[in-house]
Amino acid sequence: MSMLQRPGYPNLSVKLFDSYDAWSNNRFVELAATITTLTMRDSLYGRNEGMLQFYDSKNIHTKMDGNEIIQISVANANDINNVKTRIYGCKHFSVSVDSKGDNIIAIELGTIHSIENLKFGRPFFPDAGESIKEMLGVIYQDRTLLTPAINAINAYVPDIPWTSTFENYLSYVREVALAVGSDKFVFVWQDIMGVNMMDYDMMINQEPYPMIVGEPSLIGQFIQELKYPLAYDFVWLTKSNPHKRDPMKNATIYAHSFLDSSIPMITTGKGENSIVVSRSGAYSEMTYRNGYEEAIRLQTMAQYDGYAKCSTIGNFNLTPGVKIIFNDSKNQFKTEFYVDEVIHELSNNNSVTHLYMFTNATKLETIDPVKVKNEFKSDTTTEESSSSNKQ
């Protein structure tokens, strides 16, 4: 008969490799038994960081140069067959000495590609997913096995020479990408599962993750017998925010371009708030001339004006973008919540997951702006040169 693990017990492995060669040959130091704290933080809008602290009784810090690879594998309590693994690099590390004279190493964790901060200088593809794969392929070309998993969708972005970093490209995709299959704006983020993409329709139509709200001390050892995971310390950071929500109900979006003399508009309500978007330069390659991409994203997300946080026992299945429905005896939670940020806090014998979520305080309205197809000539230089050669 197998023993049940205590709820929140992390099945944790933390392996320290001194190089890619050591990783390839599985030559490592196991740190799980020596850690004091491990924090992993991921958000829907591009924040990925972590902190690892562990006792250094063997003076490992004297041999470290900051180019180490940290491989973290975790699994929920009583779910050891569902192990999730991610690779971190070392942004920087420090060493302190405690009251007993023992060394404690603190490593700020980050993805290897964000630490290297490689700046590109080349065009990629109009498909954002293909560009992401190509960028990571370049960054990890000398250590291909470390490349994070990529879960992409077909999303169009203007095809321009990219002269910045991978992280800035993800921000660019969030701002301008349009899913080819749905004409909806796109979310792209990184977490323990890799680099992920989904459009707005995918987010709202996904299967919800049910949780119940309660107090762990009242449930005690029976917490593992609950049908759904328990959320506690639930706090509304913002229950309703008309200051951010309502201006988008009374706005006009002007799409200005230096390539023609027209200024198409999208108006909601009386249109008293002015928003100017560009259709010049790279933005002249957008799918729609009238600012549809910006309008649907701004007007839709402005409706999600509620923000809340809660905690639960360590649950590594919860990642950014997950849809959650809460149940409680008083029926206080009437809307669906979407995970904006996840923070996992672990020691070598316990774990807690903190969730930050957005939701809507008022009834959601369907946003469907008019579409005006972009008819700019995207390759005028070639056309002019061809016509002059014919003459």
From Swiss-Prot:
One Pfam assignment: Phage-tail_2
One Gene Ontology term, aspect cellular component: virus tail, baseplate
Record field: transmembrane: none
GO BP annotation list: viral tail assembly
Keywords: Late protein, Viral baseplate protein, Viral release from host cell, Viral tail assembly, Viral tail protein, Virion
Subcellular location: Virion
InterPro entries per UniProt: Gp27_dom2, Gp27_dom3, Gp27_dom4, Peptidase_S1_PA_chymotrypsin, Phage_T4_Gp27_C, Phage_T4_Gp27_N
Principal location: virion
Induction: Expressed in the late phase of the viral replicative cycle.
Biological role: Baseplate central spike complex-associated protein involved in the tail assembly.
Quaternary structure note: Homotrimer. Heteromultimer with gp5 trimer and gp5.4 monomer; this interaction forms the tail lysozyme complex that creates an extension of the tail tube. The T4 tail lysozyme complex is made up of three copies of the proteolytically processed gp5 and three copies of gp27. Part of the baseplate macromolecular complex which consists of gp5, gp5.4, gp27 (central spike complex); gp6, gp25, gp53 (inner baseplate); gp7, gp8 (intermediate baseplate); gp9, gp10, gp11, gp12 (peripheral); gp48 and gp54 (proximal region of the tail tube).
Protein name (Swiss-Prot/TrEMBL): Baseplate central spike complex protein gp27
Species this protein is from: Enterobacteria phage T4
Origin organism lineage: Viruses, Duplodnaviria, Heunggongvirae, Uroviricota, Caudoviricetes
Underlying gene: 27
